[in-house]
């Protein structure tokens, strides 16, 4: 599990960048899933109604 400090206004792209900083996984290999939906880079956490303490799933796209 990776814990991140984020704001509701953060974009998915931004969250992926934070994951890269912590784990070294390039954003283009990350797919974030919440409530069964793949999250789009340009949207924000609040667009998806992702709240405090929510858990996202990270799926890696392998080359």
UniProtKB/Swiss-Prot annotation:
Annotated keywords: Cytoplasm, Isopeptide bond, Nucleus, Ubl conjugation
Pfam family, one: ubiquitin
Cross-link entry Glycyl lysine isopeptide (Lys-Gly) (interchain with G-Cter in ubiquitin), positions: 37
Domain of life: Eukaryota
InterPro entries, per the entry: Ubiquitin-like_dom (IPR000626), Ubiquitin-like_domsf (IPR029071), Ubiquitin_CS (IPR019954), Ubiquitin_dom (IPR019956), Ubiquitin_ubiquitin-like (IPR050158)
Site (Interacts with activating enzyme): 43, 61
Domain called Ubiquitin-like: residue spans: 1-63
Annotated localization: Cytoplasm; Nucleus
Site (Essential for function): 57
Cellular-component GO terms for this entry: cytoplasm; nucleus
UniProt similarity note: Belongs to the ubiquitin family.
Function description: Ubiquitin exists either covalently attached to another protein, or free (unanchored). When covalently bound, it is conjugated to target proteins via an isopeptide bond either as a monomer (monoubiquitin), a polymer linked via different Lys residues of the ubiquitin (polyubiquitin chains) or a linear polymer linked via the initiator Met of the ubiquitin (linear polyubiquitin chains).
Name of the featured protein: Ubiquitin
Species per Swiss-Prot/TrEMBL record: Lumbricus terrestris
């Amino acid at each position: 599990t990776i814990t991140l400090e984020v704001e509701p206004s953060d974009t998915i792209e931004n969250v992926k960048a934070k994951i890269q900083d912590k784990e070294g996984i390039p954003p283009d290999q990350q797919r974030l899933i919440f409530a069964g939906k793949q999250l789009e880079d340009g949207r924000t956490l609040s667009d998806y109604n992702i709240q405090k303490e929510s858990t996202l799933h990270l799926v890696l796209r392998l080359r």
